Amino acid sequence: MERTFLMIKPDGVQRNLVGEIIQRFETKGFTLVGLKMMQVSSELAEKHYAVHKERPFFRSLVDFITSSPVVAMVWQGEGVIASARKIIGATNPLNAEPGTIRGDFGISVGRNLIHGSDGPDTAKDEVSLWFSDAELANWTPAITPWVVE
């Protein structure tokens, strides 16, 4: 079963959107298999955003992610990576469709509420960066037969 990493960023936590964001993925029928609220260290933030290390916004991105707690999550389900990207919306909230998380709640690209893995390889790397195997639950919700064939 496919898994993806999602992180509600400090702005989403501070704006009390954690429940609303989680609900969107639960309602879709995906399974939450890992969840933790945490203060991100600079070391973890730098590893997570290493692909942006040479970009001019790297330091401000690391500073933002470490400024306040985040909610790190692992979700599981058929097509969860692509579907999560659609639920999240475009990186720039001003370009995000209404009905998406960023389209409904975001205003600024620097405060776009949530991060989601962009593909299977990234998802695998991000899940293992943020969670140990022991922190992930292997379970099947009772509703699964009502969601997927």
Curated annotation (Swiss-Prot):
GO terms for molecular function: ATP binding; metal ion binding; nucleoside diphosphate kinase activity. Its main location: cytoplasm. It catalyses: a 2'-deoxyribonucleoside 5'-diphosphate + ATP = a 2'-deoxyribonucleoside 5'-triphosphate + ADP; a ribonucleoside 5'-diphosphate + ATP = a ribonucleoside 5'-triphosphate + ADP. Gene3D superfamilies: Nucleoside diphosphate kinase-like domain. Keywords: ATP-binding, Cytoplasm, Kinase, Magnesium, Metal-binding, Nucleotide metabolism, Nucleotide-binding, Phosphoprotein, Transferase. Its cofactor is Mg(2+). The keyword Lipid metabolism does not apply. The active site is at residue 115. ATP binds at residues 9, 57, 85, 91, 102, 112. Its EC number is 2.7.4.6. InterPro entries: NDK-like_dom, NDK-like_dom_sf, Nucleoside_diP_kinase, Nucleoside_diP_kinase_AS. The keyword Phosphoprotein applies. One of its GO terms (cellular component) is cytoplasm. It is found in: Cytoplasm. GO terms for biological process: CTP biosynthetic process; GTP biosynthetic process; UTP biosynthetic process. Disulfide bonds: none annotated. It is an enzyme of class 2 (transferase). Major role in the synthesis of nucleoside triphosphates other than ATP. The ATP gamma phosphate is transferred to the NDP beta phosphate via a ping-pong mechanism, using a phosphorylated active-site intermediate. PANTHER family: NUCLEOSIDE DIPHOSPHATE KINASE. Belongs to the NDK family. HAMAP family: NDP_kinase. Homotetramer. This is Nucleoside diphosphate kinase. It comes from Microcystis aeruginosa (strain NIES-843 / IAM M-2473).
